[in-house]
Regions:
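A general structural signal for short secondary-structure junctions and capping/turn motifs
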Residues: 68-70, 92-98, 118-120, 169, ...
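Extended, charged alpha-beta segments that form solvent-exposed binding/catalytic grooves
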Residues: 104-194
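Generic recognition of stable, solvent-exposed alpha-helical segments in well-folded globular domains
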Residues: 18-25, 29, 137-144, 148, ...
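A glycine-rich phosphate-binding loop feature that marks nucleotide/adenosyl-phosphate handling sites
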Residues: 47-51, 165-172, 324-326
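Class II aminoacyl-tRNA synthetase-like tRNA-binding/catalytic domains
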Residues: 2-119, 127-131
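A generic secondary-structure signal for well-formed alpha-helical elements
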Residues: 30, 34-41, 149-160, 311
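A translation/RNA-centric and nucleic-acid-associated enzymatic feature enriched
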Residues: 109, 180-337
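Extracellular structured ligand-interaction cores
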Residues: 100-102, 123-127, 205-207, 249
Length: 337
C-alpha cells in the first residue's frame, strides 16, 4: 500500500470539471512564460531510448528501469526516467547556440517510486536545457535562472487566480527565494534527517533553493543521491516549496549546471561508476564534444498541486493507486483522477 496523509478539513478548491480546465491553463501559461523567460523552444521528446547509449537517467542509481526489446530488431530499449542527458546531446544535434535552449513535455515511468501524496509511478515534467558559456558555470548564473523560474511560477499563479476566483482564498507565493547549501542546512539542523531539514527551512523561510547535492557532507553522507553524470554536484540544487495542505516541503524542480569534462571525471570516480566512461554519452562529455549547459526538470503535476492547493498528486494526474489508497481518499473527499 502506498503511504497517504489525509489532511484535516481538506476540501478541493475546484470541482473535477474546473480542475481539468485549470490543469490545462497552468500547463499552457507556465510553459509560455518559461520559454519567454529562458529563451527556450519546444522539441519532441523520446518516450524510450536504447539502453546501450547511456542516455537514460540513473536517478539515484538503484531504481529499476522499465526495459523491453523490440520485435523487429531485438534492440533493448528503456522507458526514460528523465531526459537529463538526452537533452544535452539534442542541443548539439539540433544546432542550438549559446543563450538558446529547448524544452519538452517529458513523460516517464518510475516503477520503484515510493508512492504517496507527492509521488506517483507516472512522472510528467517540463524537461529543459540551455546552452551556456564556460564562464557561465558559476553560482551567480545558477541563482539567476532559479529566480527566473520562481517568477514564472508566480506569474502563472496570478493569472490562474484571475481566471478561477475559487482559488483566491489560497495564499499567493512571492518571488523571494532563500538559497542555502546542503552543508549549511546540516550545520543548522544537525539532529534532523535530510527531509526534516528541508521541512524546517522551507517552513521558516518559504521558497528555498537547496544547493550542492550529491557529494558527502561532513557527516559522511550526502544530503540526497545524485547521478554523477549530468549535474555538477557543486552547481546544482532542488527548488522547494511549502505544501500548505500537507504541511511539508516538496520539490518542484531538480536542476543544475551540467558536468564539465573535469567534473564528470571526478564524479564518476567518486561514485564508483568508472565503467560508464566507455558509453557514448559519457565519452562525448569527457572528450569535450558536447556544449556547456544548464537544465532541469519541473514537475507538471507538482506545479498543478502547488497552484491548486491539492493534497494528493492523484487529484491532478491520472495514475494507478492501490485500492486502500483510493478508498481512503474517497472517504476523505479527495477525488483521484
Amino acid at each position: 500500500m502506498s503511504k497517504i496523509i489525509i489532511p484535516e478539513n481538506y476540501t478541493p478548491a475546484l470541482n473535477l470539471y474546473d480542475t481539468q480546465r485549470a490543469i490545462g491553463t497552468v500547463k499552457r501559461l507556465f510553459a509560455d512564460t518559461l520559454c519567454a523567460t529562458l529563451n527556450l523552444y519546444r522539441v519532441s521528446a523520446p518516450l524510450f531510448v536504447e539502453a546501450s547509449t547511456g542516455l537514460n537517467d540513473d536517478l539515484n542509481g538503484v531504481e529499476r528501469k522499465v526495459t523491453f526489446d523490440t520485435k523487429d530488431s531485438g534492440i533493448e530499449v528503456q522507458v526514460v526516467q528523465s531526459l537529463a542527458k538526452w537533452k544535452r546531446k539534442a542541443l548539439k544535434d539540433y544546432g542550438f547556440r549559446v543563450g538558446k535552449g529547448l524544452y519538452c513535455d517529458m513523460n516517464a515511468i518510475r516503477r520503484d517510486e515510493d508512492m504517496d501524496n507527492l509521488h506517483s509511478i507516472y512522472v510528467d515534467q517540463w524537461d529543459w536545457e540551455k546552452v551556456i558559456r564556460e564562464e557561465d558555470r558559476n553560482e551567480a548564473y545558477l541563482k539567476n535562472v532559479v529566480r527566473s523560474i520562481v517568477s514564472a511560477v508566480c506569474a502563472t499563479e496570478m493569472n490562474l487566480h484571475a481566471m478561477f476566483p475559487q482559488l483566491q482564498d489560497l495564499p499567493l507565493h512571492t518571488p523571494n527565494v532563500t538559497f542555502i547549501t546542503t552543508q549549511e542546512l546540516e550545520d543548522k539542523y544537525p539532529d534532523l534527517t535530510p527531509k526534516e531539514r528541508e521541512n524546517a527551512i522551507v517552513k521558516e523561510n518559504g521558497t528555498t533553493f537547496l544547493t550542492k547535492i550529491g557529494a558527502p557532507l561532513k557527516s559522511g553522507k550526502p544530503h540526497d543521491g545524485r547521478a554523477p553524470d549530468y549535474d555538477d554536484w557543486d552547481l546544482n540544487g532542488d527548488l522547494l516549496f511549502w505544501n500548505e495542505p500537507l504541511q511539508c516541503s516538496y520539490e518542484l524542480s531538480s536542476m543544475g549546471i551540467r558536468v564539465s569534462p573535469e567534473s564528470m571525471d571526478r564524479q564518476l570516480t567518486a561514485a564508483g561508476c568508472d565503467d560508464r566512461r566507455e558509453l557514448p554519452f559519457h565519452k562525448a562529455v569527457l572528450n569535450g564534444e558536447l556544449p556547456y549547459t544548464i537544465g532541469g526538470g519541473i514537475g507538471q503535476s507538482r506545479l498543478c498541486m502547488l497552484l491548486l492547493g491539492s493534497a494528493h498528486i492523484g487529484e491532478v494526474q491520472a495514475s494507478v493507486w492501490d485500492n486502500a489508497t483510493r478508498e481512503a481518499c474517497e472517504k476523505a473527499g479527495i477525488p483521484l483522477l
